[in-house]
Amino acid sequence: MSTGPLLIIWHSRTGTSEQLAQAAHQPAGADSRLLRAEEVEPEDLLAAGGYLFCCPENLASMSGEMKEMFDRCYYPVLGKIEGRPYATVIAAGSDGEGAQRQIDRIATGWRLKRVTDRWIVNTEAQEAEAILAPKTVEPEALDRARDLGTALAEGIAQGIF
């Protein structure tokens, strides 16, 4: 059983991942913490009962800031967070599978337990101007993010995971 709040770790360049992370955090309230990837320290991961990783896919890979967080924190928490639940939200202009695979491989190394289906939010941005432009997330996706945050936080708090 996990203890501690849901830790929502995010990075965003154009707003999609940030909006989704904030939406997931909003209903979870005191049962969650929202931290930008650059702010996360190993102690934050150790204190959390589970994780929601929200980031964009950039050039078929997770964003550099999210990768840097994993690089900084991987070994200090290795062997100390096994079995904790996690979920992901990937923002992508097309498929998002590269970023998803990278995070899943890291989570496997940490022996985390995926507790939701993979979720990739496709912005369909294909041209440079559209890719770089600020994004507004559709209300349906924000609702789904709120539901995800609520379910994860409640599952952790109730010892379901």
Regions found by a protein language model. Name each.
Residues 1-3, 81-82:
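Short, flexible coil/linker segments at domain boundaries that flank nucleotide/cofactor-interacting
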Residues 2, 117-161:
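Glycine-rich phosphate/pyrophosphate-binding loop and the adjoining helix
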Residues 2-28:
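N-terminal beta1-alpha1 ligand-phosphate binding loop
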Residues 5, 31, 85:
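Residues at the starts of beta-strands that form the adenosine-phosphate
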Residues 20-28, 103, 148, 152:
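Hydrophobic residues within alpha-helices
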Residues 21-31, 108-113:
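Short helix-loop-beta junction
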Residues 30-40:
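A short, well-structured beta->alpha microelement
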Residues 38-122:
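Helix-loop-strand module that forms the ligand-binding subsite of alpha/beta enzymes
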